[in-house]
Amino acid sequence: MQGNQAVVDYMNELLSGELAARDQYFIHSRLYSEWGYTKLFERLNHEMEEETTHAEDFIRRILMLGGTPKMARAELNIGTDVVSCLKADLQTEYEVRDALKKGIKLCEEAQDYVSRDLMVAQLKDTEEDHAHWLEQQLRLIELIGEGNYYQSQL
């Protein structure tokens, strides 16, 4: 099936973002493991797996539309401590959210409702799961302090 080229090109941009998010979560999860924060490791490892699924969904759709997936990832923003890792991941999720909203609009204009629905599902996951959880963690750090937060993540 030949898809709208603008949609395919934009999905490749989204794929690049998902690959970067996956790799960033991978590195951050391993940092958490190294630092002894088991709960943070487990959560970020789970997020990495979800980002891999998001990337796979885009790859399958790009192929279905007759395109070639571009596997180059966007730049990573690697933190140096728990707070900077959480903030970097939240910024990445905000960027993904904004890109998905733009992609949804493009798909509607191109009348590609299947690609649109894929992006809507990923937007829901980004806003209601990933970004929300990261916002909660940063809010907890503000409320209970870094030391208490770190202790809760062992």
Curated annotation (Swiss-Prot):
This protein's UniProt keywords: Ion transport, Iron, Iron storage, Iron transport, Metal-binding, Oxidoreductase, Transport
Disulfide bonds: none
Ferritin-like diiron domain mapped to chain residues: 1-145
Binding, Fe cation 1: E18, E51, H54, E127
UniProt xrefs under InterPro entries: Bacterioferritin, Ferritin-like, Ferritin-like_diiron, Ferritin-like_SF, Ferritin_DPS_dom
EC numbers: 1.16.3.1
Pfam families in alphabetical order: Ferritin
Catalytic activity: 4 Fe(2+) + O2 + 4 H(+) = 4 Fe(3+) + 2 H2O; Fe(2+)(in) = Fe(2+)(out)
Biological process (GO), any one: intracellular iron ion homeostasis
Enzymatic class: oxidoreductase
The keyword Repressor appears for this protein: no
Binding site for Fe cation 2: E51, E93, E127, H130
CDD domains in alphabetical order: Bacterioferritin (cd00907)
One GO MF term attached to the UniProt entry: heme binding
GO cellular component terms attached to this protein's record: cytosol
Ion transport found in the keyword field: yes
Biological function: Iron-storage protein, whose ferroxidase center binds Fe(2+), oxidizes it using dioxygen to Fe(3+), and participates in the subsequent Fe(3+) oxide mineral core formation within the central cavity of the BFR protein shell.
Subunit and partners: Heterooligomer of 24 subunits, arranged as 12 dimers, that are packed together to form an approximately spherical molecule with a central cavity, in which large amounts of iron can be deposited.
Family classification: Belongs to the bacterioferritin family.
Designated name of the protein: Bacterial ferritin
Organism the protein comes from: Neisseria meningitidis serogroup A / serotype 4A (strain DSM 15465 / Z2491)
Record gene name: bfrA
